[in-house]
Every structure is written in C-alpha cells, then in structure tokens.
C-alpha cells in the first residue's frame, strides 16, 4: 500500500510539473525568415512568439478568440497601457448587457489585467487577464490573453510599431 501511495504521489507531482512547463514562458527554436522583434501568434497552438533572431524566440502560452471570433493577419502595436481601464466593445456588451460601460484599471473584474498592447486596425489587444485559467484555450472575442506576469515581460520587450502577425 505504501509503495502504491508513493507512486501516486510521484505521478501527481510529475503531472503538476508537466502542466506548469506547458504553462510557462520558454526559449525555443524558431524558423528563419521572420524579422527579429516581430510578435507571431499561432492560434492553433495557442502560443505567442517574440522572435529574437538567430533562430530563437520566446514562447508564451495565450488564450485566443473563440471559434467565429478569431482574426488573422498583420497589425502593429499602437499603444502600451499599464492597468488600463476597459470599455466593453459593442459585441461583448450585447452578449453581456449587465456589464458596466467602463471597468476601472486595476479592478479585479477588469479583464485587461496588468497591461495591454493595443493593436492597429481595430479593437483588439494583447493583454493580461483576470481569468488565468483561460490561458491555453479559445476564450476571447478576438483579443490575445496572457498571464499577467507574461504580459508584463512582453510589455518591456516591445515598442510602439512592433509588428504582430496572427496565423492559424
């Protein structure tokens, strides 16, 4: 019985480590041909890559748009915001009419988390979250959600004008 309990505890521990590793930022190999400094989001992988050059990138786990809410293409970072207030877009407000018109930055109910990188061409952003359990899923209306510690890291590494490419 004692050996079985130890094996179960060891298995549970290994599973927790594997889950944590899948949920962690990491340095990975990345194909050539993408300009260093570019952010690449692969929605099928639910991962965001910051291309560093020399065949390397930082990979972060993310949540992406639900089916029917995803978008693909190229944008650029056009704003950097710490603890941003959030005004629900019309589609979100229509689906959730009880939402207030504005949720203050820093509020636990604010879905933007600790920081946001707004993207050119629309209402989309790469931002933190108040729902960390959604990371790794198809959860949003099109924004890219990151763990708060990851958006804080990415926020420091990118600047206005950074290209962002979203692919399948």
Task: Give the location of each predicted region.
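Sec/Tat signal peptide C-region and signal peptidase I cleavage site
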Residues: 19-24
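Bacterial N-terminal signal peptides that target proteins for export
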Residues: 1-10
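Bacterial N-terminal signal peptides
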Residues: 9-17
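Conserved interaction-surface patches within small, structured recognition/assembly domains
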Residues: 31-40
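Residue-level signal for tight coil/turn positions that link beta-strands
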Residues: 43-45, 121
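Structural recognition of beta-strand segments within beta-rich domains
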Residues: 40-42, 49-50, 145-146
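Exported/periplasmic cell-wall-interacting domains
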Residues: 26, 34, 54, 59, ...
């Amino acid at each position: 019985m004692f050996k079985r309990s130890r094996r179960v505890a060891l298995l549970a521990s290994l599973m927790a480590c594997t889950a944590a590793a899948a949920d962690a930022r990491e340095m990975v190999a990345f194909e050539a041909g993408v300009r260093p400094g570019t952010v690449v989001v692969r929605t099928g992988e639910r991962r965001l890559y910051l291309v560093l050059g020399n065949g390397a990138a930082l990979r972060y786990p993310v949540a992406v748009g639900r089916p029917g809410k995803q978008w693909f293409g190229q944008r650029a970072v056009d704003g950097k915001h710490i603890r941003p207030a959030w005004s629900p877009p019309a589609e979100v407000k229509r689906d959730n009419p009880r939402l207030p018109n504005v949720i203050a930055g820093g509020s636990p109910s604010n879905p933007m988390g600790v920081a946001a990188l707004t993207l050119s061409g629309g209402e989309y952003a790469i931002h933190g979250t108040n729902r960390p359990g959604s990371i790794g899923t198809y959860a949003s209306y099109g924004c890219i959600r990151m763990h708060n510690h990851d958006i804080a890291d990415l926020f420091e590494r990118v600047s206005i004008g950074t290209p962002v490419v979203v692919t399948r």
